[in-house]
Amino acid sequence: VVLGKKGDTVELACNASQKKSTQFHWKNSKQIKILGNQGSFLTKGSSKLSDRADSRKSLWDQGCFSMIIKNLKIEDSETYICEVENKKEEVELLVFGLTANSDTHLLEGQSLTLTLESPPGSSPSVKCRSPRGKNIQGGRTLSVPQLERQDSGTWTCTVSQDQKTVEFKIDIVVLAFQKASSTVYKKEGEQVEFSFPLAFTLEELTGSGELWWQAERASSSKSWITFDLKNKEVSVKRVTQDPKLQMGKKLPLHLTLPQALPQYAGSGNLTLALEAKTEKLHQEVNLVVMRATQFQENLTCEVWGPTSPKLTLSLRLENKKATVSKQAKAVWVLNPEAGMWQCLLSDSGQALLESNIKVVPTWPTPVQPMALIVLGGVAGLLLFTGLGIFFCVRCRH
């Protein structure tokens, strides 16, 4: 038994006992001649394989009279007979085909179905291994639900029949962004860079996209930017005036926000609709903004944007332990000491964002000499007026 792959080439062996050229014939199960020889010439019969069958003439003088069948078809599955030296050798050929149900370019979350084509009467089994090492077994139909971006690559599938095996390689491309979600941490006023790299590469990439943004302070989301993608080049269609984003013209998709401000802190969803695909690619992006301020006798550290309840916000004087540290979005210190203070946002001891602010010492305001002169003059005038009134009243009495 020899197993072959649909569309591939197979070689059926036939050897003579002596290493010399002799007459041979290959026939199918209906005794119809496929090919043979006449001296040193290759002859062909009237079978359906006449245009796809061949033999290695260079090996005839070694007693090797194999038949090569190109572009195999499922219907080529049958028993073939080699007649040489007054003897017959039978070889059973079974041809299998393994194909994806619709397309080998699938969006993340979609299902992959592999269908096995097999000759009548066979009972093969299929075992496939994904690029991330996951094994899937099945019969004539093999289904893989909820594809992940790690499933992109070459799938190796082994078809087994009668203790023989044949291996298939199928390239699957999972259309997705490299990350499902990302968070950018910035101090107030800093420039913000958003990047959306794709987890796949294609020769031609055409589609359109949009970034919707839900600011933490806003009651509803709004579209920040829309764009087109053609031959891996990006062109902006529409962009808001506040904020006015800038977008790179080449892949990977790249957005720049001039300043990180509290009113922009929030979550966004970038969608990318590819040509000939009904569903869209998605990536979530978050922006967390930090502000450290001093007002009168109060030093405050605040963050805006989506943060985990487990994150810790702290304020500490340089080279000292934290004065205040808690799982909150705002902390403050009353009457802070003079020096450089650090506002720190951390996750399990790992710093995510920090901002430094210098607290200047406050001194009592000195009394100016001119103020003393004015106060003295006013006091003298009041005293003089009071004495005058006193003596006038006394004289009248």
UniProtKB/Swiss-Prot annotation:
Residues 1-369 are extracellular. The keyword NAD does not apply. It is a single-pass type I membrane protein. Glycans are attached at N15, N269, N298. It holds the Pfam family CD4-extracel. It comes from the Eukaryota. A lipid is attached at C392, C395 (S-palmitoyl cysteine). SMART domains: IG, IGc2, IGv. Disulfide bonds join C14-C82, C128-C157, C301-C343. Palmitoylation and association with LCK contribute to the enrichment of CD4 in lipid rafts. Phosphorylated by PKC; phosphorylation plays an important role for CD4 internalization. Keywords: Adaptive immunity, Cell membrane, Disulfide bond, Glycoprotein, Immunity, Immunoglobulin domain, Lipoprotein, Membrane, Palmitate, Repeat, Transmembrane, Transmembrane helix. GO terms for cellular component: cell surface; plasma membrane. Residues 99-176, 177-290, 291-347 form the Ig-like C2-type domain. GO terms for molecular function: coreceptor activity; MHC class II protein complex binding. One of its GO terms (biological process) is cell adhesion. Residues 1-98 form the Ig-like V-type domain. Residues 392-397 are cytoplasmic. It is found in: Cell membrane. The chain crosses the membrane at residues 370-391. Forms disulfide-linked homodimers at the cell surface. Interacts with LCK. Interacts with PTK2/FAK1. Binds to P4HB/PDI. Interacts with IL16; this interaction induces a CD4-dependent signaling in lymphocytes. Interacts (via Ig-like V-type domain) with MHCII alpha chain (via alpha-2 domain) and beta chain (via beta-2 domain); this interaction increases the affinity of TCR for peptide-MHCII. CD4 oligomerization via Ig-like C2-type 2 and 3 domains appears to be required for stable binding to MHCII and adhesion between T cells and APCs. The Ig-like V-type domain mediates the interaction with MHCII. Integral membrane glycoprotein that plays an essential role in the immune response and serves multiple functions in responses against both external and internal offenses. In T-cells, functions primarily as a coreceptor for MHC class II molecule:peptide complex. The antigens presented by class II peptides are derived from extracellular proteins while class I peptides are derived from cytosolic proteins. Interacts simultaneously with the T-cell receptor (TCR) and the MHC class II presented by antigen presenting cells (APCs). This is T-cell surface glycoprotein CD4. It comes from Cercocebus atys. The lineage of its organism: Eukaryota, Metazoa, Chordata, Craniata, Vertebrata.
